[in-house]
């Protein structure tokens, strides 16, 4: 079984870098084609309801809301030390939209209903009505107490030395936090953990953000320091409740466990339905794992400044084309994973797709070649599949720093007299800045449909929200629910990989799927001058020796780099232009079963080099990459003189540890 997490692969060989000349593409005039979403196209092909769950409107809406919430948390840059409204205030309009209904009523809990409905559809399991009703009733109370908390916070912000307002705010906080704490068991009802998981993840997110509030502002509200310390961390087995640190651990491990359990169930129940398996993986990644990966940054004592995070995972849209036979609509999941999913590698940027065409007969695509580069580097590799063709046409993608992404793909598909044979006949790749590029080899026909694929839109760009202002625009946030996103100014994912499957009996590539990465993955590893910058280790550009990329555990927002004995990884980062001298502490988030010496080398823009060996302590004794298996270590300090942007090369080397160690992120902390 090739699941989304916990498998290891060797890094692909990158010796071949054969590039091919570009063939000019033209927008050939054709018939006016009907444009459909995937489910509509499948219904047209089969005259029955399709199992393509991602286009169920409930799933779409829940995924869009989750996408917007994650984007909001990624984009927030509140000053940590300032007395400001909570990060929660930015998310309230998504959790409880103003148009949903009167506050505290069942109708106002539409977002939580959508999360449950979506996970029900994806897991093929319905929540018992009594359990659903209990959860909704809990949300009614939480909303009511939350509104008291926001009001008390607004009152205090206007008069921060008023002891009565401080007292009321402390009481409102305690009531709100108690309601969340007492409700969490109702959001993980036994037997329904998976269909309630996307709702649970957002409930946990709310609880953690609320505890972050009290750690940040509790002294100003009049709490004693010992009380704040307990809200931050409490390991006493008998007294009090777990603090923020303990809850990040337990909530993370819970969400990852039930995500993996659900994915295993999809694998077992849908062996010849990769779409169902992939739907669960993609949508639950967006609704659950993406926000989970940001929870470590809620620790204000470890992240005392706003933090710039990135998601590097890849998600895939539905299979298009003909992969099965008369008995099964699709090939088995294992085969589809091998053909359609990119092998774990350093994070890549697609630069060229070359199609090898044979424009005769039924099947036209004989082969395809893709060229990739790594982040902030000309290093890369080429991946080939299939056979030679008579004609070659290319799609050229500009360099990553240009920011001209492919944000949507329209695929020309038509049905055939062969059962289950829906034939892909061409593509239109939509770019965010330049003109569309097309691949087509025959004129359109009346039986064709254009299938649009991409991911949800991000929510409105609001970096702060003042709920205290009755005229604040964020009180009326309305996400763009179009799917795929119809506005290239707020797209959430960029196209990154063209998976293609070869049917040996036809010597042609007959089925395809598209990989997409999140737009938070930056093109040049730019370090922020004022915020903590997280650079995932997979954003490196070179692996040497026994280094390889392994699948992440689900809680890290992407894959990890494992350094075996005598191996290293190099990462290129860009420092910002500055009028003053900038300094950064470099910190690793890593996993190791033994103490070991890590070699650290930094090559500066003037080619001077700083090297040192650092003793890193073991972080775990086991093999499972649970939350507590990861730990942090400050490995050094760099400064930059007053200068324009510069490139630094950071190389991490394992000289001696035979069992190897795993790197999640490299963090640059301004000092």
Language-model-detected regions and their locations in the chain:
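Extracytoplasmic
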Residues: 396, 400, 404-671
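Short low-polarity hydrophobic stretches
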Residues: 87-91, 95, 353, 409, ...
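Charged, amphipathic alpha-helical linkers/stalks
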Residues: 107, 111-156
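Short amphipathic alpha-helical segments that mediate assembly, nucleic-acid/protein binding
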Residues: 5, 29-38, 59-62, 80, ...
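Membrane-inserting hydrophobic helices used for pore formation or membrane fusion
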Residues: 3-6, 10-13, 156-519
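Intrinsically disordered, low-complexity coil segments
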Residues: 101-109, 156-164, 238, 577-580, ...
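Membrane-inserting effector segments that mediate pore formation, membrane fusion
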Residues: 47-123
């Amino acid at each position: 079984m090739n699941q989304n997490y916990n498998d290891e692969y060797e890094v692909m060989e990158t010796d071949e870098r054969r590039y091919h000349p570009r063939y000019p593409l033209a927008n050939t005039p054709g018939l006016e084609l009907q444009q459909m979403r995937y489910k509509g196209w499948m219904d047209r092909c089969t005259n029955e309801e399709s199992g393509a769950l991602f286009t169920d409107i409930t799933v779409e809406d829940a995924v869009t809301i989750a996408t917007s919430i994650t984007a909001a948390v990624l984009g927030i840059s509140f000053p940590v030390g300032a007395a400001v409204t909570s990060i929660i205030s930015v998310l309230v309009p998504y959790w409880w939209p103003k148009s949903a209904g009167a506050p505290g009523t069942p109708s106002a809990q539409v977002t939580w209903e959508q999360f449950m409905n979506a996970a029900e559809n994806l897991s093929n399991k319905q929540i018992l009505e009594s359990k659903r009703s209990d959860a909704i009733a809990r949300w009614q109370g939480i909303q009511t107490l939350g509104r008291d908390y926001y009001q008390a916070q607004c009152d205090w912000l206007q008069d921060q030395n008023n002891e009565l307002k401080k007292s009321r705010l402390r009481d409102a906080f305690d009531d709100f936090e108690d309601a969340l704490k007492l409700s969490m068991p109702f959001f993980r009802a036994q037997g329904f953990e998976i269909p309630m998981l996307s709702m649970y993840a957002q409930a946990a997110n709310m609880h953690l953000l609320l505890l972050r509030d009290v750690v940040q502002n509790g002294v100003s509200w009049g709490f004693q320091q010992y009380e704040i310390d307990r809200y931050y961390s409490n390991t006493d087995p008998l007294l009090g409740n777990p603090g923020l640190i303990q809850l990040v651990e337990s909530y993370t491990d819970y969400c990852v466990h039930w995500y993996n359990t659900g994915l295993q169930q999809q694998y077992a129940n849908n062996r010849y339905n990769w779409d169902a398996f992939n739907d669960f993986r993609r949508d639950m990644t967006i609704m659950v794992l993406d926000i989970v990966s940001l929870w470590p940054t809620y620790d204000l004592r470890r992240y005392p400044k706003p933090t710039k995070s990135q998601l590097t995972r890849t998600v895939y849209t539905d299979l298009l084309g003909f992969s099965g036979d008369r008995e099964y609509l699709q090939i088995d999941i294992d085969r589809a994973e091998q053909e359609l999913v990119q092998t774990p590698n350093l994070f890549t940027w697609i630069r060229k797709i070359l199609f090898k065409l044979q424009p005769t007969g039924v099947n036209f695509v004989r082969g395809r070649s893709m060229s990739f580069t790594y982040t902030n580097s000309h290093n890369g590799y080429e991946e080939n599949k299939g056979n030679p063709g008579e004609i070659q046409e290319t799609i050229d993608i500009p360099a990553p720093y240009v920011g001209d992404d492919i944000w949507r793909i329209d695929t020309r598909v038509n049905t055939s007299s062969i059962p289950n044979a829906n034939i892909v006949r061409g593509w239109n790749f939509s770019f965010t800045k330049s003109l569309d590029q097309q691949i087509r080899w025959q004129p359109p026909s009346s039986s064709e449909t254009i299938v649009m694929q991409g991911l949800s839109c991000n929510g409105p760009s609001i970096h702060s929200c003042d709920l205290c202002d009755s005229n604040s625009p964020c009180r009326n946030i309305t996400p763009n629910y179009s799917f795929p996103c119809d506005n290239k100014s707020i797209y959430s994912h960029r196209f990154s990989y063209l998976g293609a499957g070869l049917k040996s009996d036809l010597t042609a590539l007959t089925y395809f799927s598209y990989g997409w990465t999140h737009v938070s993955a930056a093109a040049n590893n730019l370090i922020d001058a004022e915020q903590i910058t997280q650079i995932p280790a997979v954003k490196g550009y070179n692996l040497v020796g026994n280094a390889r990329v392994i699948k992440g555990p689900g809680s890290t927002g992407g894959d990890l780099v494992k350094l075996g004995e005598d191996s290293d990884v190099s990462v290129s980062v860009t420092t910002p232009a500055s009028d003053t001298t900038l300094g950064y502490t470099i910190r690793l988030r890593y996993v190791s079963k033994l103490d070991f010496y890590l070699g650290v080398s930094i090559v500066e823009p003037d080619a001077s080099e700083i090297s040192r060996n650092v003793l890193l302590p073991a972080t775990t004794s086991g093999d499972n990459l649970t939350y507590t298996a990861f730990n942090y270590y400050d490995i050094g300090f760099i400064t930059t003189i007053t200068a324009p942007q510069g490139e630094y090369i950071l190389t991490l080397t394992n000289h001696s540890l035979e069992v190897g160690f795993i790197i999640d992120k490299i963090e640059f902390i301004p000092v």
